[in-house]
A protein has these predicted regions:
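Residues lining hydrophobic/aromatic ligand-binding pockets adjacent to catalytic sites
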Residues: 1-127
Length: 128
């Protein structure tokens, strides 16, 4: 019998999310459901010397209450430079930063071309 996991997409998936995927035979990305504001779909936290900081992908939500995750458009492509700068500033002295930076930076570069939140989340999930 196959083990299956079904989950909504998250921006920069956390270790538990990756562990869940590794523990099943089939993983289904469930993004054909309603987008929810102030959730992990378009944001995540990083550690900074001042405490945690939210990294949020700006998305179009005004007047789109019933939009699905896979229909949610990114409203400002400048989020990429801001997020990458925050990651660099706060993790450049971390162990293994140089190793991780070499494969993480190209993901942010690829994300520039993606107009939908779901596509960005899928990109990070597939590569991480």
């Amino acid at each position: 019998m196959s083990k299956v996991a079904i989950s909504q997409s998250n921006y920069i998936p956390w270790k538990g999310y990756i562990d869940m995927i590794a523990s099943v035979d089939v993983f289904v990305l469930y993004d054909d459901m309603q987008y929810t504001k102030r959730d992990w779909r378009n944001r995540n936290k990083i550690k900074t010397p001042q405490g945690t900081k939210w990294l949020s992908i700006p998305v179009e939500v005004k007047g789109k209450y019933f939009q699905k995750i896979n229909e949610t458009k990114i409203s400002d492509p400048n989020w990429i430079a801001s997020h990458w700068s925050s990651i660099q500033q706060n993790y450049k002295k971390a162990p293994y930063y140089a190793d991780v930076c070499h494969w993480l930076k190209p993901l942010f570069d690829q994300a520039k071309e993606l107009p939908l939140l779901s596509n960005v989340n899928r990109l990070f999930l597939q590569e991480i």
